[in-house]
């Protein structure tokens, strides 16, 4: 009986040590490539062939991350479109970009979605290799970020309305 208790105790301690060492190993960052500096300009090609720079030549940019299959993203892209229309009418110096996080969605599918939500006037791009979502630390669909003219993210939210997007662009220098 004593041998069994000793054996159990030894195995329990060994198991805890193994679990602890595995947990600590998982906490380490093994990615040897540093994240890109958000202030360094990035260029993406929209689905209609436009080159879009982030940040956009000294002016703030609202960037919304979505997927056509995301039901919650409908209102967010619609709000982005409304904010873009308001900025154009007021002459505010701001840029807009809708970024599809699903590389499997076709250009035609994205175009149809943008038309459906009345945001076809907003440039849209596919986040190839998750380059933009990684660069700006976006992990969830339906996320909007505002980037000022220097490349700094000044605002981050999930599905803000058009008024909030416009107000945050003004704060960022529009």
What would you call each of these model-derived segments?
Residues 2-14:
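Bacterial N-terminal signal peptides that target proteins for export
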Residues 22-26:
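C-terminal motif of bacterial Sec signal peptides marking the signal peptidase cleavage site
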Residues 27-53:
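N-terminal "domain-start" segment that seeds a small globular fold
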Residues 44-46, 123-128:
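Short acidic-hydrophobic, aromatic-tinged amphipathic segments that line or gate anion-handling sites
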Residues 53-74:
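Short active-site neighborhood of thiol/selenol oxidoreductases, capturing the structured segment around
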Residues 58, 118-119, 128-171:
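Thiol/disulfide oxidoreductase modules built on the thioredoxin-like
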Residues 62-63, 96, 144:
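Hydrophobic beta-strand anchors of alpha/beta hydrolase catalytic cores
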Residues 74-117, 128-131:
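Structural microenvironment flanking redox-active thiols in thiol-disulfide oxidoreductases
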């Amino acid at each position: 009986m004593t041998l069994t208790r000793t054996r159990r105790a030894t195995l329990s301690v060994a198991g805890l040590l193994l679990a602890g060492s595995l947990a600590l190993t998982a906490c380490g960052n093994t990615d040897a490539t540093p994240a890109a500096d958000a202030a360094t300009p990035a260029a993406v090609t929209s689905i209609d062939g436009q080159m879009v720079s982030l940040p956009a030549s000294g002016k703030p940019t609202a960037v919304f991350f979505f997927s056509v299959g995301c039901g919650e993203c409908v209102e967010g892209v619609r709000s982005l479109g409304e904010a873009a229309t308001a900025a154009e009418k007021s002459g505010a110096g701001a840029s807009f970009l809708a970024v599809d996080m699903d590389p499997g969605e076709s250009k035609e599918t994205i175009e149809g979605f943008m038309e459906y939500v009345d945001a076809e006037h907003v440039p849209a791009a596919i986040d190839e290799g998750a380059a933009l979502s990684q660069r700006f630390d976006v992990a969830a669909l339906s996320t909007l970020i505002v980037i000022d003219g220097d490349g700094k993210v000044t605002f981050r939210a999930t599905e803000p309305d058009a008024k909030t997007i416009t107000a945050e662009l003004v704060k960022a220098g529009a």
